[in-house]
């Protein structure tokens, strides 16, 4: 219930159908103790049945879920959400990219990931200093709560790299 109104949670296939042809989706799988054994494969089937394999990424804090996604369909791009970026995490075979908070990103992290053909996706980049840092480090994806602010910061800077990011935000 929201503001006194009864609401229903939309089904994934309905969300995909609304987004089709407009935006790509980051589908986060949050696992729990009560999940069925087929939970992850059911998500993959929905992605496949809606012809959305190349229009989404699937992310999770649970590496086992990402491994299951790749077992079901290796073409689906997967991202490991990291609460902290410590240790030797770079060579996880079922991960195409790492999603991490902006404070954990530095040149060494980006360089090591890129050497293994892994991307770095950074969240939550809501100010121009963080945006500039991410662009300078050549991260692969920026996640923000403030798209208008990010566009403004990029437009103000005027750099070629910033212009490339701006085009991705459009």
Regions found by a protein language model. Give the residues of each.
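Metal-dependent phosphodiesterase/phospholipase catalytic core, i.e.
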Residues: 1-77, 94-95, 100, 114-116, ...
């Amino acid at each position: 219930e929201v503001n006194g109104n009864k609401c229903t949670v939309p089904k994934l296939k309905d969300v995909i159908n609304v987004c089709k042809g407009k935006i790509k989706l980051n589908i986060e799988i949050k696992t729990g103790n009560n999940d069925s054994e087929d939970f992850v494969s059911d998500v993959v089937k929905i992605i496949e049945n809606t012809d959305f394999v190349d229009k989404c990424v699937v992310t999770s804090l649970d590496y086992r879920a990402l491994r299951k996604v790749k077992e079901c369909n290796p073409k689906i791009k997967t991202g490991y959400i990291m609460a902290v970026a410590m240790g030797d995490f770079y060579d996880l075979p079922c991960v195409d990219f790492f999603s991490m908070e902006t404070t954990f990103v530095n040149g060494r992290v980006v360089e090591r990931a890129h050497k293994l053909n892994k991307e770095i996706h950074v969240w939550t980049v809501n100010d121009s200093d963080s945006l500039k840092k991410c662009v300078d480090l050549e991260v692969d994806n920026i996640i923000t709560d403030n798209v208008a602010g990010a566009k403004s910061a990029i437009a103000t800077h005027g750099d070629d790299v910033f212009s490339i990011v701006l085009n991705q935000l459009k």
